[in-house]
A protein has these predicted regions:
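Short pre-active-site segment immediately N-terminal to redox-active cysteine/selenocysteine motifs
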Residues: 59-62, 67-71, 128
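Bacterial N-terminal signal peptides
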Residues: 26-33
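Bacterial N-terminal signal peptides that target proteins for export
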Residues: 4, 12-25
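Sec/Tat signal peptide C-region and signal peptidase I cleavage site
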Residues: 36-41
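A short beta-strand-turn-helix
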Residues: 44-62, 92
């Protein structure tokens, strides 16, 4: 609410400045609280040796996503329905090291990365996309998944079966 202090002097007073500041402070506190409670998205590594080492030292499983990120419809669907969901990100932060072995058609890719991904695809006999390989900390394959209906909840349940052996 604006109130003129004196006729003709052009000065105005904002009534309730104290309340306005209180509201701003409360809003800032809420934004900070919400922002700090959101867990960071897990990092998708591309270096196999680094990912394997991290899985071993952190005692987590290594999930390797063999994907055609810019052309494979099922890969894009898996990313949209599973990997981008908060419940998967939460699960991954606690239990997985994530690695993407991408086989793009339109995106440029470093020669060394392309070679590494091709060697991994041969090693794990990848026949199609998406293929998800799950390895233990010692690099032993404990499971293989692909796209499945049911979203993040179903996918996490399958990962839990593999994790618990």
């Amino acid at each position: 609410m604006l109130r003129v202090l004196a006729p003709g002097d052009g000065l105005v007073e904002v009534a309730g400045v104290k309340n306005y500041r209180s509201i701003l402070f409360a809003a800032a506190a809420i934004v900070f609280a919400v922002g700090s409670s959101v867990q960071a998205a897990p990092e998708w590594l591309t270096d196999y040796k680094k990912a394997q080492q991290e899985a071993k030292t952190s005692n987590r499983l290594l999930l390797v996503d063999f994907t055609g990120s810019d052309w494979c419809g099922w890969c894009i669907k898996l990313d949209k329905e599973v990997f981008s969901k908060p419940e998967f990100k939460d699960y991954a932060n606690k239990n997985l090291v994530l690695m993407e072995a991408d086989f793009p058609r339109a995106k440029a890719q470093a020669v060394g990365l392309k070679k590494q991904n091709q060697e991994l695809a041969q090693q794990y006999q990848i026949q199609g996309f998406p293929t998800i390989i799950v390895l233990n900390g010692d690099g032993q394959k404990i499971g293989e998944l692909g796209y499945m209906e049911g979203g993040a909840t179903t996918f996490i349940a399958e990962l839990e079966k593999l994790r618990k052996g």
